Amino acid sequence: MDCLTDLRSTEGKVDQAGKTLILLVVWWGFGTTAEGHPLQQLWELPCDCSGGYVSPDLPITPTPSIAVASPLPDLRVWLQGSWGWGGGFRQQWECVFKPKIIPSVQEQPGPCECLTIATQMHSTCYEKAQECTLLGKTYFTAILQKTKLGSYEDGPNKLLQASCTGIWETSMLGPRCPCVCLDGGGPTDRFGRICAEGLEEIIRHSYPSVQYHPLALPRPRGVDLDPQTSDILEATHQVLNATNPQLAENCWLCMTLGTQSPQPSRRMAMSLSMEIAVLASLSGATHRVNRCQLLCREADNRTGIPVGYVHFTNCTSIQESLTRRVIYEILRDYVLHRVMYLCVEQHAYTALPNKWIGLCILASIVPDMSIIPGEEPIPLPSIEYTAGRHKRAVQFIPLLVGLGITGATLAGGTGLGVSVHTYHKLSNQLIEDVQALSGTINDLQDQIDSLAEVVLQNRRGLDLLTAEQGGICLALQEKCCFYANKSGIVRDKIRKLQEDLLARKRALYDNPLWNGLNGFLPYLLPSLGPLFGLILFLTLGPCIRKTLTRIIHDKIQGSKNPRISPAVQATPNRDGYPRSMV
């Protein structure tokens, strides 16, 4: 027993000595920790810059996720890691100076501190930019944080994206980029948008939109023709006076609006002014040329210029244009006679080259003109002439009246059928609803009668219980109430209402309008309107068609008018070839 007690006391002393030794080792070996700042003991304070100061020119890629706020306004601190010589990884605080703020001088940007001017700079390469002045010009200065290569968007036809060169370098950028590029919404894009809006505003002020007055003021209707049109009309009148003087004394010369279609004819002899006016009217496709004797020129030079082959007429004689004599004749024909060479339908040549390939015909060009005698009305009337045509307007009155009657009949017949059918459906629905309502009232009356029986039964029971006191009324010392049963009156009215509903329903079904044609008449009524309209259309349709055909025929006949048809007569020239004269 004593040995066991000594052993336990010895174990307690050993445990106490071990705990004391552990506390001493902890106290002497590890030291104290900074309360609340365990990272400061491991990495030191950020402002101490244990990793040193990093130059902005070095290619450093900081990690923003571990950046800390520096109490100094001109420093930016980053936690960077590096591998040691023994293979361990060590982290230290490195500091980079922030860009200095350029103060403004007299409400103008301050002077620039750097002299590197970049031609382009993308907005994703820097965080902030500020304005500065250099040699009287305003620039944007910023510290680049990454590089970027310029790239195309969807091929070379799009604008080029701006690039950036130099990490952590202070660069300047002008407000306008010398190259056509985009900087991702930066200063260049903003100034370009402002310049475009300014140019659009200048254009709007320089060329204001025309605002027409709603009132059309009268003005004199004089001759307001361009010189070319006047020359064409004068030349045409000269030709008409030479061919038909009687018609030229009193006539109308009308030209079509829009693109003119000149008419070719063979070598018309006319004055120089006439030829100039005729040649000025060449602007469209030519017409077919059907003449008695037509002289064509053909050349088949393999090294020549193709001018085309005429295919809208038949050549009576073809001459090969290969010799110098023929070339001289071509030039002489144009100089003396002012003829044209038609090789295709849409082109006319005043002269042909030395070497050419094709088949051409000699012709002159006359304008597409309509000639109307002076005593006849103009087919294309003016506004005043249209307002006075009352006789033709009368022809449309029967047509309009017939269309109005037909439309009214169709609408009335269809509406009548639909309204009658709808009335029948509404009457049936109303009868059914009233019958359902009367049945509901009858059920309520049955409930009231059963409740009255229960109340009367309770009254008799209370009178028996209070018989010694003279009844329930004397016991309560109140006026006695009695039940007046009027359920018979309500039931009589409900029965009469149901009988009236049955009579109305029977009378509705006994109507011949609904029982006609074995019950099909209600379904045929909505189609009576369209059926009547079809019959009316078949009756009046031939008359309307005949009237419209006659009116269209009169319009076509009235628009026909005589055209210029020059008379062509083949006469031999001094070279032996036939020549046409007007």
From Swiss-Prot:
Q: Which residues form the signal peptide?
A: 1-35
**From its record, what is one biological process in GO terms?**
virion attachment to host cell
Where is the site labelled Cleavage? R392, A393
For the Extracellular compartment, the record's topological domain ranges are 36-519
Disulphide-bonded residues: C251-C254, C251-C481, C473-C480
According to the record, glycans are attached at: N241, N301, N314, N485
Top-rank taxon of the source lineage equals Viruses
Per UniProt, the keywords (alphabetical) are: Cleavage on pair of basic residues, Coiled coil, Disulfide bond, Fusion of virus membrane with host cell membrane, Fusion of virus membrane with host membrane, Glycoprotein, Host cell membrane, Host membrane, Host-virus interaction, Lipoprotein, Membrane, Palmitate, Signal, Transmembrane, Transmembrane helix, Viral attachment to host cell, Viral envelope protein, Viral penetration into host cytoplasm, Virion, Virus entry into host cell
Where a lipid (S-palmitoyl cysteine) is covalently attached, the residues are C543
> How does the record comment on the protein's domains?
The 17 amino acids long immunosuppressive region is present in many retroviral envelope proteins. Synthetic peptides derived from this relatively conserved sequence inhibit immune function in vitro and in vivo.
Q: Where is this motif: CXXC?
A: 251-254
What function does the entry list? The surface protein (SU) attaches the virus to the host cell by binding to its receptor. This interaction triggers the refolding of the transmembrane protein (TM) and is thought to activate its fusogenic potential by unmasking its fusion peptide. Fusion occurs at the host cell plasma membrane. The transmembrane protein (TM) acts as a class I viral fusion protein. Under the current model, the protein has at least 3 conformational states: pre-fusion native state, pre-hairpin intermediate state, and post-fusion hairpin state. During viral and target cell membrane fusion, the coiled coil regions (heptad repeats) assume a trimer-of-hairpins structure, positioning the fusion peptide in close proximity to the C-terminal region of the ectodomain. The formation of this structure appears to drive apposition and subsequent fusion of viral and target cell membranes.
> What is the protein's given name?
Envelope glycoprotein
Transmembrane ranges, per UniProt, are 520-540
In its miscellaneous comment, the UniProt entry states: Strain A is a helper virus of the strain T.
Q: Which Pfam families match?
A: TLV_coat
What is the organism of origin for this protein?
A: Avian reticuloendotheliosis virus
